[in-house]
Amino acid sequence: MEMVDNRQALMKMLVKELGFSEKQVRHVIQLTEEGNTVPFIARYRKEWTGSLDEVQIRAILERWQYMMQLEDRKEEVIRLIGEKGKLTGELRLQIVKATKLQEVEDLYRPYKEKRRTKATIAKEKGLEPLAEWLLLYKKEDPAKKAVEFINAEKEVQSAEEALQGAQDIIAEMISDEATYRSWIRNITFRKGIMSSSVKGEEKDEKNIYEMYYSYEEPLQKVVPHRVLAMNRGEKEDILRVSVVPPVDEILNFLNKKVIRDNDSKSAHYVQLAIEDGYKRLIQSSIEREIRKELTETAEEQAIHIFSENLRNLLLQPPMKGKVVLAVDPAYRTGCKLSVVDDTGKVLHIDVIYPHPPVRKYDDAKTKVLSIIDKYQVEMIAIGNGTASRETEEFIVDVLQSVKQEVFYIIVNEAGASVYSASDLAREEFPNLQVEERSAVSIGRRLQDPLAELVKIDPKSVGVGQYQHDVSQKRLNESLTFVVETAVNQVGVNVNTASVALLQYVSGLSKTVAKNIVAKREEDGKFTKRTELKKIPRLGAKTYEQCIGFLRILEGANPLDRTGIHPEQYKNVELLLKSLGLSIDDVGQPQLQKRLEEVEISKLSQETGVGEPTLVDIIDALISPERDMRDELPKPLLKKGILKLEDLKRGMELEGTVRNVVDFGAFVDVGVKQDGLVHISKLSKQFVKHPLDVVSVGRIVKVWVDDIDTKKGRVALSMLPIE
């Protein structure tokens, strides 16, 4: 019964903390414990959750997991202290009421098994009674009292040694007091300073950390990216980083708390013990705790930015139905070419040498013109790596000789080389060279960014900030969640999807994804969703979790094309029948007209299906193959080129946001280097974070603010330059 009550109390805390209703929190936890996935709950259990989205559901589950860990630790600490016979009712209550793991550890600290410290050695020498006597603040002279504790057998040779031992005991007592540590932690964070100085300037060849060579900032004001920059500089042995606490204020606080009689002769010795206790035992551990907390906050921010950037990258609109010529640029080894048809099938692989040192420019031009004509190429995708701008100039020249309308686009090729050398790429294209696979990947990225990018480790897609300096476990969890959410929001064509894409579908493991592809290759395309029940290791629960996200576009049942879950098929058929329609009318204009006239609340009462689910069903019936990505702005198509020398201050340009960081956004305006729009130039209004204004893949209007031709840098502004 106590466990049930405790769960309910924790849920109430969660409700208060996150601002959701008790019903929402309870249902999310219950549904998860029953084996339902986050995408499934978000999509198909809206009535239960009050239409919470994936991010909100995850926030509840993460906080709940922390609370469970906290409760487990409390129980363990209570047991450990109890076994020592030192658990009082008051201490038990303090532990039970703790809301953070740090508070529990502070309370447990005095009872922890300690390695031999100065205090434990002093206690072994029988000096604890002297320490207790000093804290009574009697009128007697401590030096005289200490004589009683001289003991050659216990290696206490003098009164001074006895007093020193007693002070060591008092110092540890102060260090172990949870309320003191908590106050010191808070005041250090509120009034302390983050300081960095140069340690190994010769190692900082590019002067990356120059601003931190002599740097101070209040702890409360240090922004996440500076915390991570200083951490990295310290790790590389270039910087010396420390926390400077308000020492005098802390010592005054401890003196007032511990010394009850300043006139007593004991006060002097206790004061020395206080200073030693703080400087030797508390200061450095509080500094570690604060820096750990700052780092964790900074990591969360870096992971959040990376996750948002990745989400926007994955959800870029696909270029459907286009034959694409993809170019993976290079100098010496030549530009690799691939032509992929509108389904992503590879039609042609080639190589050209338009650049030095080989430079067969005319041959390259003739070959590209021939390819465009032969395969009726509609779009050219150029990777943005080495030799990208020179290749762009070459393609612009080629396009001047092309009669039909062909556009080109610069594609972010980050991670393409990682993918092309992977086992997955070797499996997919066993007969292609690494660079040829890379060219195919670039072309397919343009056609369907999501389907192609899931094949790459999310950390390699080039939209992170300090991703190598954060907790890799936490980063992987967050990025996997982003990919899963994107894949399930879009839905997957089960007859064309790769294992890499299928493994992110709600409920599916990599093994089951492989089994689906193997079955498809063996027996041909799936014609209805129910056929997936025959897949090895795809049981009833897995089927329930995954099937709504898997689409069969040319199947026997038109509902299998939609995001409607089969559990609702009977209700859908009854709904259509009541309107004089059938499932064969799905996606037809007459069905759209009739459904738009439907009164949702009335229909909900008649069918017993919740309103949010009904809205989703009607949307799916009207637009069965709707892709949420189609509603986003299309990538920026190009026909001409810009050079750095062409730019003038105040020039208005259109560009694509390539990366968003704490201090601004990098925008590709068609010159060699992406230009930086500093956070201060994003909007006339105050901008808390660049992500509030821009996102990866977004097309933005910018003005040239400053050009540094020497360093090849461009400063841009989203505010008109006067």
Feature annotation, model-predicted:
Residues V667-S683:
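OB-fold (S1/OB) nucleic-acid-binding surfaces
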Residues E103, I409, G415, S420-V490, ...:
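Long, charge-rich intrinsically disordered scaffolds of nucleic-acid metabolism proteins
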Residues V687-K701:
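Short nucleic-acid-contacting surface segments enriched for D/E, G, S/T with interspersed K/R
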Residues K710-E722:
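OB-fold/S1-family single-stranded nucleic acid-binding modules
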Residues Q56-A59, Y66-A326, R332-S420, L424-N431, ...:
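Duplex nucleic acid-engaging cores and interfaces of nucleic-acid transaction enzymes
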Residues D662-V667, D674, G712-V714:
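Short aromatic-glycine-enriched beta-strand elements
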Residues K648-D662, V700-V702:
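Structural detector for short beta-strands of small beta-barrel domains
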Residues T37-V38, T49, D53-T120, K125-Q157, ...:
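Accessory alpha-helical DNA-binding modules that contact the DNA backbone or grooves
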